[in-house]
UniProtKB/Swiss-Prot annotation:
Lineage: Eukaryota, Fungi, Dikarya, Ascomycota, Pezizomycotina
Function: Alpha-glucuronidase involved in the hydrolysis of xylan, a major structural heterogeneous polysaccharide found in plant biomass representing the second most abundant polysaccharide in the biosphere, after cellulose. Releases 4-O-methylglucuronic acid from xylan.
GO molecular function terms attached to this record: alpha-glucuronidase activity
Domain of life of the native organism: Eukaryota
Presence of keyword Glycoprotein: yes
Keyword ATP-binding set for record: no
Gene Ontology CC, one term: extracellular region
Protein name per the record: Probable alpha-glucuronidase A
Signal peptide annotation: 1-19
Organism encoding this protein: Aspergillus terreus (strain NIH 2624 / FGSC A1156)
Length: 841
């Protein structure tokens, strides 16, 4: 495959002089080295057979013109008449129109719906789609090749893995986004659809370029007011924006809408008045949006209304909507995320992980053929590691789709770098061995394994108005990769990532290698410093889903239990002695999970309750593995900062600085995670770290041990989220606090870190002094910078570190920190750490 040589000086000049904020994502169409030879390798005109205004073919023309001009400076003309002459031409059409106009079909490969054929030879380019949407995908593919410097001749066809490739937005009518970390909604504000949908159009471009064909625009915890006539008109405007990109819109529904909006006094799915009401609503929507994709419903879960109120089945509920949609060709996506969040942990056999199979298996075959059951990838809730949901192996006669999460609800909320495809592939590549036959999850959701007509993919994305879309430039790799995987799930995670890097940051080899190394290390690192051995992400499940709080997993009805006590830990999900969850899997898989000696260590605590002293395959005990993994993960995160800093001057300053800020934050917050989890289990088990690290921090100065004026000690809760379990806060919200001490460290050059708490509801200010000389000043404004769910408490969510590098310190120097409170935030401090070169606290 021929790639044009990179003119390094020219490309560096381009990257340094063009400021980029991330809004274009991977569709930058940035200039590439292109001389006369390059121009000759490009077509000079575009012929689009039977293109109509507002069609995906017209969009393809616009993208080809914009892309080629942006990358090479060459302007492509558009032929006004249909012409099959390929000389110096990019011909784009549907297969049907090409056969009709050009009367030549001998060499066209067979394509599925949305598939395309791309053939390039010299400056002749042929793009044929089975549909107009497929032709648009082919145009984006050609532009992607050019953007990566690939001008080679190709001749290949590709078709989608599954017909449904949707994204879900959890946008609320007031403009907020549930589990969104990048600003308010691009669709809604103040109970209505926003008047300016320009960002929605840009989002449609990005989605179409990775072959997404459907979007649910509102939160699954839906508001019935979306169905007012005014808002239906607004939805039609959204559909008009997405239609030229081949994307059909759908909406999430509130099951009780016939009562709360329609005033019927009931929402019984078998009541004739309810059936009629939904039929009328559906007809009204299709009058406005003839190509509407369909509905998504969350019912009978987490307080959302559902058919169980009337002793009806989930199939009764799903079929209510499916039958209303069927005359219009719409799809009914029904979430399998149904469970009781008030179950009793004291009953050993209770298990939220059993809920999906318990609710849905008995209904297999009772759903209409346009219903797809949308199943989260694991049995609980988007954890850092879960086994495959057993429901995939228990629905033989029902269409299914997998639900992934691009938004990092439990995985660092875009403030921690976590490249997700390696995690997703542990699920999609897993062979469930149904009836002792190959039953790979990706083949189940495509419909191939059980011969189902529908199926596919859904991902919760939650972009916002932030210029980066997701809050973090590097998190966009997950959205790009999701689209690629939904089209072709056997694609390699590294190859997908590197295509995204070249499209997003250019073709500099050092940039490519560095971001690849960081990204591929990121999920293992996050798993290491959050939750190991299948114990789940040990975050605060009762509050933000962000920082550490392992105690929150237990003692409540939400069912994300660890059953940790002073001696042992883990869920016993065996049939023999536990909840029976292992028995929900096909026999070959059940045998593995039932037997502790066969269960892989990375899922040990998911399926087995063991003593902390249980030996793993590595020879380590469970508790020592916890300690070691948390230290290893945090150490990896520290390395992300110098790796990124090696890219200074190779990436434009705006994106470089924004990403460096997040990686520096992640390095500090990974230490918070490491210490919190290790201290919690050390305190619980009483078993010390054999390497003597946990609870031993010789380079720290605890704030409460310093001389305090205007500050007072404060017992932090959860206790483990503060070093030595204690912070200091100002004595009042109007009192300036001072903490000072004389340093006893050897003279030398140190990186000085200050761990503090940045609470929501105030922006305190701090100043750090050595011998009354200012080392640095900062403000507690992370809520304006980072975007994760904030906290009003001193805890693992608000805990944060700032570091001042290369500070010269002499033994006997006087350290002083002055904190000025603001609002409800009492300028809280945890500790100061003095790190010699090469030392990780």
């Amino acid at each position: 495959m021929l790639r044009l040589p990179l003119v390094l000086v020219w490309s560096l000049w381009a990257s340094l002089t063009v400021a980029e904020n991330g809004l274009n994502g991977w569709l930058r169409y940035a200039p590439i080295p292109c001389d006369g030879r390059c121009h000759k390798a490009l077509p000079s005109r575009i012929v689009a057979l039977n293109s109509t205004q507002g069609s995906p073919l017209e969009t393809a023309i616009e993208e080809l013109q914009t892309g080629v001009r942006g990358m090479t400076g060459k302007r492509l003309s558009v032929a006004k008449e249909n012409n099959c002459n390929l000389h110096a031409t990019a011909l784009i059409a549907t297969v049907e129109e090409y056969r009709r106009t050009c009367r030549n079909s001998s060499d066209i490969p067979d394509l599925d719906v949305d598939g395309f054929w791309l053939r390039t030879e010299g400056n002749n380019v042929q793009i044929l789609g089975q549909s107009e949407r497929g032709a648009l995908y082919g145009a984006f593919e050609y532009l992607s090749m050019l953007a990566q410097g690939d001008f080679s001749s190709v001749d290949y066809s590709t078709s989608p893995h599954a017909p449904v490739r949707w994204v879900n937005q959890w946008d609320n009518m007031d403009g907020s986004i549930e589990r969104g970390y990048a600003g308010p909604s691009i669709f809604f504000a103040q109970g209505q659809i926003v008047p300016d949908l320009s960002r929605a159009k840009q989002y449609a471009r990005l989605l179409a370029s990775v072959r997404i064909n459907g979007i649910i625009v509102n939160n699954v915890n839906a508001n019935a007011t979306l169905l007012t006539p005014q808002n239906m008109d607004g939805l039609a405007r959204i559909a008009n924006v997405f239609r030229p990109y081949g994307i059909r819109i759908g909406i999430a529904l509130n099951f009780a809408s016939p009562d709360t909006l329609g005033g019927l006094g009931t929402y019984d799915p078998l009541d004739p008045s309810v059936i009629s009401w939904w039929g009328n609503i559906t007809d009204s929507l299709y009058e406005r949006i003839p190509d509407m994709a369909g509905y998504l419903v969350k019912a009978s879960s987490e307080g959302q209304p559902g058919p169980d109120t009337y002793n009806r089945t989930l199939a009764d509920g799903a079929n209510l909507f499916a039958r209303a949609l069927k005359p219009h060709g719409g799809v009914m996506m029904f979430r399998a995320f149904v469970y009781d969040h008030h179950i009793n942990e004291s009953i050993w056999t209770n298990d939220r992980a059993n809920a999906q199979v318990d609710f849905f298996k008995k209904l297999d075959g009772q759903f209409e053929d346009n219903v797809i059951v949308q199943i989260k990838y694991g049995p609980i809730d988007f954890q850092v590691r879960e086994p495959v949901s057993p429901l995939f192996a228990n629905l033989y006669h029902t269409n299914t789709a997998i639900e992934l999460q691009v938004t990092q609800e439990y995985l660092g909320q875009q403030c921690h770098l976590v490249y997700l495809p390696p995690l997703w592939k542990t699920i999609t590549d897993f062979d469930l061995r149904v009836d002792h036959s190959p039953s790979v999850v990706r083949d189940i959701i495509s419909g191939e394994r059980f011969n189902r007509p529908l199926g596919g993919w859904a991902a919760v994305v939650n972009v916002g108005t932030n210029d980066t879309w997701l809050g973090s430039h590097l998190s966009m790799s997950n959205l790009y990769a999701y689209g690629r995987m939904a089209w072709s799930p056997t694609d390699d995670s590294v190859e997908i990532l590197q295509d995204w890097i070249r499209l997003t940051f250019g073709r500099d080899q050092h940039v490519l290698d560095t971001i690849t190394d960081m990204s591929m290390a990121s999920w293992p690192a996050y798993e290491n410093y959050t939750g190991n051995l299948g114990i789940q992400t040990l975050t605060d499940i009762l509050y933000t889903h962000y920082g550490p709080n392992p105690a929150s997993q237990d003692g409540n009805g939400w069912g994300q239990w660890t059953r940790a006590d002073h001696d042992s830990i883990g869920m016993d999900r065996t049939v023999k002695n536990g909840t029976g969850n292992a028995g929900q899997y096909p026999a070959e898989i059940a045998e593995i999970y039932e037997d502790i000696d066969k269960t892989p260590d990375d899922l040990l605590l998911w399926f087995h309750h063991v003593p902390y002293t249980h030996r793993l395959d590595s020879g380590k005990t469970v508790i020592q593995h916890f300690y070691d993994a948390h230290y290893a993960g945090a150490e990896t995160a520290q390395g992300f900062v110098p790796q990124w800093e090696s890219l200074r001057g190779r990436i434009d300053p705006e994106r470089y600085d924004a990403m460096r800020t997040r990686l520096v934050y992640q390095a500090g917050h990974s230490i918070v995670w490491r210490d919190a989890i290790n201290n919690f289990y050390w305190n619980l088990s009483g078993i010390a770290d054999t390497n003597g690290r946990v609870g031993h921090h010789p380079w720290r100065v605890e704030a409460e041990s310093m001389q305090l004026q205007g500050y007072q000690p404060y017992a932090v809760s959860p206790f483990e989220t503060a070093s030595n379990y204690t912070a200091v806060v100002t004595t009042s919200n109007s009192t300036t606090g001072t903490a000072s001490t004389t340093l006893d460290f050897p003279s030398g050059t140190y990186d000085v870190g200050v761990n503090y708490f940045d609470m929501y509801g105030g922006k305190s200010r701090w100043s750090l002094y050595l011998n009354d000389k200012v080392v640095g000043k900062w403000e507690g404004n992370s809520e304006d910078v980072l975007g994760h769910t904030p906290s009003i408490y001193l805890d693992g969510h608000s805990a944060i570190r700032i570091t001042f590098n290369g500070v010269k310190v002499r033994k006997g120097d006087r350290l002083k920190i002055v904190g000025v409170p603001d609002g409800v935030e009492p300028a809280p401090l945890d500790y100061v750490v003095f790190l010699p070169q090469g030392v990780i606290d």
